[in-house]
Amino acid sequence: LNEYFKSNKFKHILHKYEELCKENGSSFLDSEELADIAEYYHLTGKEEEARAAATYAVNVFPGATAPLCFLARTALFVDKDPVKAELLAEEIIDKTDLDYYYLIAEIMMMQNKHEEANKYLSEHFNEIAADEQQDYIFDVASLFCDYGLVELAQKWLSQYEDTEAKDYKELKAKILLWTGKSNESEDVLNELIDSNPYSTTYWNELAECHFVRGEYNESITASEYALAINPEDEDALLNKANALYSIGNGDEAINYYKRFQKVTVGARQNFVNITIADIYLNQKKVEEAFKYFTKAIENSEAKEETYIQMAISLMGNGYMSDAYKLFSANLQRVSEDWNIGYAYYARCCYELGLMDEYNRILGIAIKKNLVETKDLLADLYPEDSKPEQYPLLTPTPRKGKANDNTLPF
């Protein structure tokens, strides 16, 4: 949770709101305080209460920016409804508010209109008051970075003037990591750690930096520094679990994944159930694996996506037929912008000898996710051939038939 939500100030605001809900209080809360309460409920997995708080705020303060932004983002990310998000955004009275600009850009980005979003934000730059322009530049760079649009993020950040600012260096480190410059990112992070060795954020980002380079033991060490500062730091627990998983220490990885689940909530709590199940399956503990697969599906708000993650695990553990059934049933049900699992599905078809289906899914995989396609299928084609060329080439003949392992459930 954000440090603000742990503060006494916020706890006091939350208490006042809860008393209002019980009709025991008569305190005044402004629209931004109510929006913060909605955000808190959202982060703690209480979606119904989150919507109720934001809706109450809009009823009391019609057209207020903060609660309408919250409801619009809920429509966008939870309901997957950009039209509803746009309608809520249009209710905002102050359409010169920076948060309104950011919201409209996010709606565009969620519809894969990245260049349109950049153009929109650029066009509004000259409308920003001179003393707010640098903040605007930084916010836009951060926004693009959050969406993984690192080239656009770097373009905006290059216009930021205070290159010695802590916030600038933090964002620069993230962008460098995203663009594959992990050594440079590490240099910036070490500089930040020297300035504040008690920041769990910096240690966690250093752990991620080592992780992407495959330096798993170094990643574990960085995570342990963060955990020494805060034994319940969510990112540190997750980073250490992931690194332990990557070096094959399944039992310890499960221990840290479960510790992570105890201190987090909502979707973030649930997604590691698949990973725990995967470890148990790899250890041939099928009943335990089934238990965690079931948990993951039951607690998922997007069951098709969870089934696809389950299929990837099954495939990796040799249950090719079971994985194939899940891929074929669920990839046709996901949203248009979903891009994970198609190359895995194609590989399943190949291993099962379903070459007509392989060729059909291969074309979809290439359109959806070139990186995944190369990772999963490159060994079937001549070295240095590009994924876009795969449909024109003949894959290497299978050396043997996929095993017929199936799960007893």
Say what each PLM segment does:
Residues 60, 91-95, 127-129, 162-163, ...:
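Structural marker of alpha-solenoid helical repeat scaffolds
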Residues 57, 89-92, 124, 159-160, ...:
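Canonical positions in the second alpha-helix
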Residues 43, 77-78, 110, 143-146, ...:
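Register position in tetratricopeptide repeats
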Residues 32, 66-67, 99, 133-135, ...:
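Start-of-helix register in tetratricopeptide repeats
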